[in-house]
Curated annotation (Swiss-Prot):
InterPro entries: ATP_synth_b/b'su_bac/chlpt, ATP_synthase_B_chain. It holds the Pfam family ATP-synt_B. The lineage of its organism: Bacteria, Pseudomonadati, Thermodesulfobacteriota, Desulfuromonadia, Desulfuromonadales. Belongs to the ATPase B chain family. F(1)F(0) ATP synthase produces ATP from ADP in the presence of a proton or sodium gradient. F-type ATPases consist of two structural domains, F(1) containing the extramembraneous catalytic core and F(0) containing the membrane proton channel, linked together by a central stalk and a peripheral stalk. During catalysis, ATP synthesis in the catalytic domain of F(1) is coupled via a rotary mechanism of the central stalk subunits to proton translocation. The keyword Chloroplast does not apply. The chain crosses the membrane at residues 7-25. The keyword Membrane applies. One of its GO terms (molecular function) is proton-transporting ATPase activity, rotational mechanism. This is ATP synthase subunit b 1.
Length: 191
């Protein structure tokens, strides 16, 4: 506030006070009809001056206060609009995240089912392969066992045949034939 406007306000306030005091004195002094008109005019003049002085004195601060109030209300409204827009954006983002989460859950479920089916198929294939390997090994092992048993039976048959042949020879060969065979054998080996 400038010095000039402050001085003017003080001057107006003093003039208003003097006029009010004058009108108060005038209203006490008169008692007749002409005095009533004067009193009414003084009061009217007093009201006009008081109203003018108050208007002059309060116009600036009141205007600034109302302007500041208007600005605060406008700022509050703008801030409320921004907060509402921000809340709506966050709400839309949350709604989108929920929709995305539902889609992700469905995708994960489908992926897990597919992976589970593949895993079951792999396990079945491995089990079949292991069963085939076990069968093949059992067949080879049985073939080896059969071959070993054949060889053993063959050896046993040869041994039994030799024993039988030896017994028959012992029964059929006389001691003279035996001496002759030994002599022949010694001659052949001695040569």
């Amino acid at each position: 506030m400038s010095r000039h406007s402050r001085r003017m306000r003080i001057l107006c306030l003093c003039a208003t006070t003097l006029l009010m005091a004058g009108s108060a004195l005038a209203s006490e002094a008169g008692g007749h009809a002409d005095g009533q008109l004067k009193d009414f005019l003084y009061r009217l003049l007093d009201f006009g001056i008081t109203f003018g002085a108050l208007y002059f004195l309060l116009r600036g601060p009141l205007k600034r206060a109302l302007s500041a109030r208007r600005q605060r209300v406008a700022e509050a409204l703008e801030q409320a609009r921004q907060m509402q827009a921000s809340a709506e954006r966050r709400f839309a983002a949350c709604r989108q995240q929920l929709a995305d989460a539902d889609a992700q859950i469905a995708q994960l479920t489908a992926d897990l089912k597919a992976e589970s089916a593949l895993q079951c198929q792999r396990i079945e294939e491995q089990a079949r392969k292991m069963a085939d390997d076990i069968r093949s090994e059992a067949t080879r092992s049985a073939a080896r066992e059969i071959e070993a048993a054949r060889k053993q039976l063959h050896q046993e048959a040869v041994r039994l045949a030799m024993e039988l042949a030896e017994q028959r020879l012992k029964q059929q060969i006389a001691p003279q034939d035996q001496a002759r065979l030994v002599d022949e054998y010694l001659r052949k080996t001695g040569e």
